[in-house]
Structure formats: structure tokens, C-alpha cells
């Protein structure tokens, strides 16, 4: 069995998005049990110079759904840092991202291989191939922001463990 662009990207995005959805839900339950308004967590951050939970979740969506759409269009831009969301809105964004990525078939994603993609960052333009963009830029950023979101919740008392981050693994079928 060949390992495809779909396997390397969308399948991994969906696994981790499932985990992100799960740990956001665990966070909601925890905050409600502790009489903490979950919306106050939207601006929580690990350090003063890091962007908040809101931006981490927006970036998870941008570096998954947005990355595949960027490969399709040939252009990718970073997310807007100031997009307003409450906690429920962040959960909805993850659900919408999962739904949109689930609509992509392996054949459709694999057909994007070899395309040119330009990452626009201000006045800078960084040229990539689809494979280079997804593997060396999109996936590392996706995992960074998913991990940072997990860490923000964890440092705010949400009882999370490694399995909460791992999500549903792709086990061998007997």
C-alpha cells in the first residue's frame, strides 16, 4: 500500500481535530464544574508574548482546512489574529473544519500533488510545492497550535492526558 498525500495530511488533520474537539469539550465541562466562565479562557495564553487560545484554535483550522484549500487555490495566507470567538464559537470552528475536511476524498487530495503553492506573509512570498508546503509548513504549524491549545487548557486546570491529545489512532484492522 502506497502512502499518499491524503494519508499524510487530511487523515492526520482529522485525527488531531477529533482530539482538539474532545479536549475543548473536556475543558468546557471542567470550567462549568468549577464555575469558571469558559469564555474567559478564550484569551488565556501560556506566556505574555504568546497568542491566546482563540488564535491557537483559529490556526488549527487554518493550517488544516485552510492549507488544503490553499493548495487547491495555489495561495495560502496566515489567519487574522483578531477574529472574535467565544468558547462555543471555537468549538464550532473545529466542527466546521472537520466537516469540510471530511468532504475531501483521497483521490481529490492526491490529485493536488505537485501543484505550486505560494505562502503570502506581508510583502514576502514563499514558494512551495503542495507536498513541501503540507509536510514542512502546514503540518508542523498545525501540530504546534494544537499542542499549544492543549497546553493552555492543561495549565488552566483541565484534567487532560496524552491520550486526549493523541485522538483516535489508526489501528490495524484484523
Where do the protein language model's features map onto the residues?
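Short secondary-structure junction/hinge motifs that connect adjacent elements
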Residues: 28-48, 112-119
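Alpha-helical scaffold segments that form or flank carboxylate-/histidine-based iron centers
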Residues: 2-15, 37-62, 80-90, 122-141, ...
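C-terminal end-helix/capping segment
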Residues: 154-174
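Structural signal for well-ordered, non-membrane alpha-helices
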Residues: 17, 21-28, 65-68, 95-102, ...
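Conserved alpha-helical segments that form or flank metal/cofactor-binding pockets of metalloenzymes
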Residues: 49-77, 97-100, 105
Amino acid at each position: 500500500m502506497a502512502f499518499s498525500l491524503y494519508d499524510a495530511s487530511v487523515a492526520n488533520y482529522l485525527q488531531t481535530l477529533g482530539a482538539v474537539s474532545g479536549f475543548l469539550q473536556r475543558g468546557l465541562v471542567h470550567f462549568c464544574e468549577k464555575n469558571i466562565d469558559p469564555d474567559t479562557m478564550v484569551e488565556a495564553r501560556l506566556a505574555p508574548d504568546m497568542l491566546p487560545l482563540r488564535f491557537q484554535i483559529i490556526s488549527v483550522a487554518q493550517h488544516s482546512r485552510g492549507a488544503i484549500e490553499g493548495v487547491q487555490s495555489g495561495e495560502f495566507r496566515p489567519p487574522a489574529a483578531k477574529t472574535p470567538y467565544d468558547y462555543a464559537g471555537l468549538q464550532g470552528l473545529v466542527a466546521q473544519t472537520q466537516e469540510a475536511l471530511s468532504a475531501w476524498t483521497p483521490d481529490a487530495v492526491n490529485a493536488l500533488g505537485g501543484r505550486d503553492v505560494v505562502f503570502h506573509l506581508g510583502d514576502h512570498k514563499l514558494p512551495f510545492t503542495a507536498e513541501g508546503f503540507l509536510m514542512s509548513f502546514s503540518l508542523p504549524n498545525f501540530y504546534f497550535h494544537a499542542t499549544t491549545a492543549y497546553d493552555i487548557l492543561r495549565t488552566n486546570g483541565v484534567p487532560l492526558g496524552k491520550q486526549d491529545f493523541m485522538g483516535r489512532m489508526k489501528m490495524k484492522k484484523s
